[in-house]
Structures are given as C-alpha cells and as structure tokens.
Amino acid sequence: MDSAAPVSEVRRNTYRLWIVTGLHAVGWALVYAEAQRTWGQSRGRFHVKNDWTGDGLSQNDEASHLFFGYTLTRTLSGQWRWGGMTPRRSRTIGAAESALALTLVEVMDAFNPAQGLGISDLLFDYTGVGAGLWTLSHPGDWTIRTSVKVAAHARVFAETERQSDNYIWWVTYRPQLRWGVKQPLSLGVGHSVRRAPDGITPVRELHFGIGTSLPDLVRTFAPQAARVLGILDFYYFNLNITATVR
C-alpha cells in the first residue's frame, strides 16, 4: 500500500499537468484570435509607437499592463501548482509563461499597422510579472486589482477609448486589524481616465476607495471555499471618491 500511494499521486499529477497544458494552449489560441479580430491583423512592417503620451489614454493603458502582468503570473502559477509542480517551480513557470505571452502580444502589435510596439507597455508588463512573482514568494496584504465604472460598457479587449476609460486600476491594502485574515475590507488607490467635455482630451482621475474581493468576503465564513475562489481575487468591489488630476 505504501508504494501504491506515490504511484497514484504521480499519475494524478501527470493527468493534471496535461489538463493545465491543454487549457493553456486552447486559451492562448483564443486570446490570439480575439486580439487579431479586435485590434487588427499583424501583417504590416515592424514599427514602434509612442505609447506613453501618444495613445490619448494618460497612462491608463500602462496601468492595465501592470495589472495583467501581475494577475497572469499569480493565476498561471496557481494552475501549475495545482498540476503538481513544487511551489518554486510553479512560480517560475507561471512568471515565464506570463512574460512570454505578454511579449508576444507586443510583437503582434509591432507588425500591426494600427498599433506598434509599445516600449512602456513592455516595461509595465514585466514590472507586473515581477510584482506577481514577489507576492507569491513573499505573501502580504497588498495586491493589484481592477474594477469597472459601468458594467454594461465592460470589455476584456477594449476597442475604443470609452471602453478603456471604463476601467479603474487599483493598488489595495487589507489591514488585518483584530480579525486577522478574516478581515475582508481593503483600502485602495486607483487610477483611471475620463474624457473632457470635448469628448477627446483625456482627464486623469485618482480614486480612493474601500471595498473587498469575492474571496476576501467568502473567507470570513468559509475559508476553504475562499481558496477555491482565489482566481477571482482580481476584481475589487468598492465605494470610492474621485479626484481629478490636472
């Protein structure tokens, strides 16, 4: 019986690794197809764009790249860990896969006549990957999250400035206080953009909020269920006040 248990565990982990590998392959294929449909075909000449000040989004796009680098790293690492990898290896593979995927997105943009390679986008991608990797190996009470202003306007692949402006990108901190890990509320500082009355000029916004995520809320009464819902920790349900930055 003692020898059968390790064999059974190895077989289970092998099956899980195949499941994760297959899901990732299908997922990245769908992302590629949707990106090409939304932002245009990558059939032009290689070129670089001024993405820091030239996209009319006042760095909200860079904030989104920070979020996706961070969230992808944590999510993919968790999936490889479920597949049976050691904590260290799952973190390494998750971070490498995230960095590679986000780099390939920028390479696609570099050959897209309507886009272009964004150097600042890449820098924020890699910063997000690094932040995600750091928090996996050094767990704490701060995280990077997102929320939307109007749910009806939400699009994962934003096609217009209006859709991009709908997102708020947050850095949140959850003080444990007297309740410890079951304390569900987080304080957040968020960044977003809206349009001036002319409908064109971007206006930067800072948001100061208090809120929670679904896993943090569920953890107050069902810690085991909260671990299962951990993949949903990226969304910040909040109340906030907004300050315009001129």
Model-derived features: positions:
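N-terminal targeting leaders of membrane proteins
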Residues: 1-62, 66-87, 182, 201-207, ...
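Outer-envelope beta-barrel architecture signal
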Residues: 92, 140-144, 181-185, 206
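Interfacial helix-loop-helix junctions of multi-pass membrane proteins
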Residues: 104-126
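Sequence/structural signature of outer-membrane beta-barrel proteins
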Residues: 108-113, 153-155, 194-198
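Glycine- and acidic-residue-rich phosphate-binding/metal-coordinating active-site segment common to enzymes
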Residues: 119-166
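Residues on the lipid-exposed face of transmembrane beta-strands in outer-membrane beta-barrel proteins
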Residues: 130-134, 169-177, 208-214, 237-243
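Transmembrane beta-barrel strands of outer-membrane/channel proteins
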Residues: 148-150, 187-193
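Residues that define the transmembrane beta-barrel architecture of outer-membrane proteins
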Residues: 163-169, 202-206
